[in-house]
């Protein structure tokens, strides 16, 4: 395949990194020093790459999603603590000499009395869970979810904005003295595990709330975050945690950053980001930088008028969840634009890889020769992906379908023609045979969007609408994507090489 075609491959950042061959000499840039970026850089370093740079606009590591007010007291929480992403991050920390006490999960119950469940046992149950027939499961728990939505509304304040950063907090704070309302609802662990495993939590909440305005962070906080992590989660004896005692996710991320620096990874902190403005007449927003021309690629994208007008850091009134999702993407577009500027001393080379967040598009711009990555889909699918895919510069898209079945860790082989035909004929069905092969989260929200709208409560995408002039295939777009991680890396390595 010619490199003159814009190649968009939906991959998690570190998965894309690991697919590269070791003779790739260009700079590999990672945008964002949160868990996604640190994990990407860590994987690259472990695989022997020495040309890694991390760009962070906010000037600190660890991200902004790890704290929440609990009864008006700030606690450190982990957005991904119930997922393989955090689990693998901890494994990465252990591999560089950081020890951990056994992690206990404290489940908030009536009167906030915690019941400890060993984290390892929870994870073991997660992986071992049998996935029932999805349709029966949906019918079984839809009433429960509807009930839980009401509980969730009582527990979480959707209008919360962090006054120090003006950022909308993705983990909504519990209202004072409302913790015991959790006693009004309970879901059997096996049902919760099955829903989580099938990536059905978000669609069920959408169905229950009769709205598509809620993104994944907003629709499932009570299910995801009914598990409460006490502030001393990472505390331990000095001999148990040889590299120091970690009392927060932030400090652990900082330690990872220091380790990466010791291995030669360059951090560009407080990287200048282009500003966003909207014309007073309400026309399309634009990216502006004094004395710097905005790259054509982003002029095209922004001209679609599908993205919000305000930088999230400047938001002073609550955004709808959909706008919050798009604002995240918009920030990353700003960063991408800034890094493409050739007259800035900290600009990365015009050839290289740019990794943005956990779900991303790897892009090659034939006009500049730049290989990069746009975060368009945003896990939940509410930033208008079509707006980006239909823009003039990135219309020619081609990628690969790939699927790993988590239960047996075996690759399911399809030629591209067979796979695209399967998408067209089978994804609208909900029969057991289809689900036997499609139970992994590795396709994440993208795969679910093609399901039947009457069951999922969502309008399925029309594949033809997003094909543009090329073909659109999806690859392993999990929210976290660590399932069968070694196997996926090996397969991705072979698949990417096919394009080079």
From Swiss-Prot:
It is an enzyme of class 5 (isomerase). Glycosylated. Gene3D superfamilies: 1.10.405.20, 3.30.70.1990, FAD/NAD(P)-binding domain. SUPFAM superfamilies: FAD/NAD(P)-binding domain (SSF51905). This is Polyenoic fatty acid isomerase. Homodimer. InterPro entries: Amino_oxidase, FAD/NAD-bd_sf, Zeta_carotene_desat/Oxidored. Its EC number is 5.3.3.13. Involved in the biosynthesis of conjugated triene-containing fatty acids. Catalyzes the isomerization of a wide range of substrates containing three or more methylene interrupted olefins into a Z,E,E conjugated triene functionality. May be involved in a stress tolerance mechanism as response to intertidal habitats with direct sunlight, desiccation and high temperature. Its cofactor is an oxidized flavin. It comes from Ptilota filicina. One of its GO terms (molecular function) is oxidoreductase activity. It catalyses: (5Z,8Z,11Z,14Z,17Z)-eicosapentaenoate = (5Z,7E,9E,14Z,17Z)-icosapentaenoate. Residues 1-21 form the signal peptide. It holds the Pfam family Amino_oxidase. Optimum pH is below pH 6.0 with (5Z,8Z,11Z,14Z,17Z)-eicosapentaenoic acid as substrate. Keywords: Isomerase, Signal.
């Amino acid at each position: 395949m010619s490199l003159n075609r814009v190649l968009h491959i939906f991959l998690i950042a570190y998965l894309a990194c690991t697919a590269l061959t070791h003779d790739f000499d260009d700079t590999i840039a990672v945008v964002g020093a949160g868990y996604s970026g640190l994990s990407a850089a860590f994987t690259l370093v472990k695989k022997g790459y020495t040309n890694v740079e991390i760009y962070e606009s906010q000037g600190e590591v660890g991200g902004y999603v790890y704290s929440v007010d609990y009864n008006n007291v700030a606690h450190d929480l982990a957005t991904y603590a119930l997922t393989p992403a955090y689990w693998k991050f901890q494994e990465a920390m252990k591999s560089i000499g950081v020890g951990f006490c056994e992690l206990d999960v404290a489940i908030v119950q009536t009167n906030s009395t915690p019941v400890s469940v060993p984290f390892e046992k929870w994870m073991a149950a997660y992986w071992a869970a049998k996935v029932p027939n999805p349709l029966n499961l949906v019918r079984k728990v839809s009433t429960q979810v509807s009930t839980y939505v009401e509980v969730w509304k009582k527990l979480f304040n959707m209008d919360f904005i962090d006054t120090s950063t003006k950022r909308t907090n993705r983990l909504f704070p519990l209202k004072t003295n409302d913790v015991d309302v959790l006693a009004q609802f309970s879901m059997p662990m096996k049902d919760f595990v099955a829903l989580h495993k099938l990536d059905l939590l978000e669609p069920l909440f959408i169905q229950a709330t009769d709205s598509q305005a809620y993104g994944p962070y907003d629709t499932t906080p009570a299910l995801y975050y009914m598990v409460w992590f006490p502030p001393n989660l990472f505390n331990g004896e000095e001999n148990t945690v040889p590299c120091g005692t970690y009392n927060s996710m932030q400090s652990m991320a900082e330690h990872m950053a220091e380790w990466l620096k010791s291995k030669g990874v360059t951090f560009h902190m407080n990287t200048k980001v282009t500003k966003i403005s909207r014309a007073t007449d309400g026309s399309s927003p634009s990216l502006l930088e004094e004395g710097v021309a905005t790259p054509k690629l982003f002029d095209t994208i922004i001209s679609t008028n599908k993205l919000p007008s305000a930088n999230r850091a400047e938001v002073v009134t609550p955004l709808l969840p959909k706008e919050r999702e798009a604002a995240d993407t918009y920030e990353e577009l700003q960063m991408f634009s800034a890094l493409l500027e050739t007259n800035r001393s900290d600009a990365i080379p015009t050839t290289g890889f740019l990794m943005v967040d956990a779900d991303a598009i790897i892009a090659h711009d034939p006009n500049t020769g730049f290989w990069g990555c746009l975060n368009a889909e945003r896990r939940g699918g509410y930033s208008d992906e079509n707006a980006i895919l239909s823009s003039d510069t990135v219309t020619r898209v081609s990628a690969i379908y790939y699927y790993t079945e988590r239960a047996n860790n075996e690759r399911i082989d399809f030629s591209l023609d067979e796979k695209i035909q399967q998408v067209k004929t089978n994804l609208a069905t909900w029969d057991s045979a289809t689900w036997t092969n499609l139970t992994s989260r590795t396709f994440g929200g993208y795969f679910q969007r093609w399901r039947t709208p009457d069951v999922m409560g969502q309008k399925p995408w029309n594949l033809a609408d997003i094909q543009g002039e090329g073909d659109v295939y999806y690859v392993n777009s999990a929210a976290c994507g660590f399932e069968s991680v070694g196997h996926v890396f090996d397969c991705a390595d072979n698949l990417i090489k096919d394009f080079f």
